[in-house]
Amino acid sequence: MARKLSIKLAINEAIDQEMTRDPSVIMLGEDIVGGAGADGEKDAWGGVLGVTKGLYAKHGDRLLDTPLSESAYVGAAIGAAACGMRPIAELMFIDFMGVCFDQIFNQAAKFRYMFGGKAETPVVIRAMVGAGFRAAAQHSQMLTPLFTHIPGLKVVCPSTPYDTKGLLIQAIRDNDPVIFCEHKNLYGLEGEVPEGAYAIPFGEANIVRDGKDVSIVTYGLMVHRALEAAATLAKEGIEAEIVDLRTLSPLDMDTVLESVENTGRLVVVDEASPRCNIATDISAQVAQQAFGALKAGIEMVCPPHTPVPFSPTLEDLYIPSAAQIAAAARKTMKGGKH
């Protein structure tokens, strides 16, 4: 039976159900229990935005408050995974991955390969991503492309409560390291979520809107900006098909290519910095594999190549908008076949 849950509560429920099902699932992070683990503060906070609130009461010391040292507790989580546990490490912001990058890309991502397929590292690293939270340059980045570049890592960025729960359960059960990206501006988004546990396989994009004129490919918060743009375009007689990638590594290029072959036009939207991001990757692959199907040049909608501004006015201008997406789609409709 389904009921409406926010993305924040969908994450909480996924972790709760997996911790109940599997005693090897543990969780580490800063203030995920309470005020630095002080007895009087236990379960008072549940992380910076309260995502894990209530889990300590059910699962006790399997949730561990850690010092403000991402390098230490991410390293501990990776080591625990190598020893048979299924840790979930929560970083407040993906921006802090920099201080534990060696543990992630030089250790966790490579163990299976270095040990001839015999080693497993079932660790999930959860982190908030994206701008729009008025949190300035060091707490607002969309660094997903950094991790898709690294073989051995799986990268997930859901856009709905349903997908969030199913993909997080899949991530916890997966035997490889997963970077699970949660857009901070989507935590309050509500949608239908089944009560029971379910897993959504990685590498399967979702067509969230059918259309015949132009394909809009994106992920995370930008899915909702794309839907807003599509509603505007529909009033002008332009029907946009929207592909929600859901997982960025593995990347479902088959669905993207099939959509482009049906519409002949492509707009790729990415909140990440425009150099070497998901949009450039998809654009290159479509140009290589489906050039003959294109009726117009590929359009990319990305932020400028700058740090995320602190000024609310500038930050709003920095983030790709529905108006920009609609303008890019209109441009493809006017383009001639090259």
From Swiss-Prot:
Q: Name one GO biological process term.
A: acetoin catabolic process
Answer yes or no on keyword RNA-binding: no
Query: Which keywords annotate this record?
Result: Acetoin catabolism, Oxidoreductase
Pfam families named in the record: Transket_pyr (PF02779), Transketolase_C (PF02780)
EC number(s) stated in the UniProt entry for this protein: 1.1.1.-
Keyword Oxidoreductase in the entry? The reply is yes
One example GO MF annotation: oxidoreductase activity
Q: In which pathway does it act?
A: Ketone degradation; acetoin degradation
- Domain of life, per UniProt, equals Bacteria
Kindly summarize what the UniProt induction comment says about this protein's expression. By growth on acetoin.
What's this protein's function? Catalyzes the 2,6-dichlorophenolindophenol-dependent cleavage of acetoin into acetate and acetaldehyde, in vitro. The beta subunit is probably not the catalytic subunit of the enzyme.
SUBUNIT field: Tetramer of 2 alpha and 2 beta subunits.
Which NCBIfam families is this protein grouped with?
PRK09212.1 (NF006667)
- Which named protein is this? Acetoin:2,6-dichlorophenolindophenol oxidoreductase subunit beta
Record organism? Cupriavidus necator (strain ATCC 17699 / DSM 428 / KCTC 22496 / NCIMB 10442 / H16 / Stanier 337) (Ralstonia eutropha)
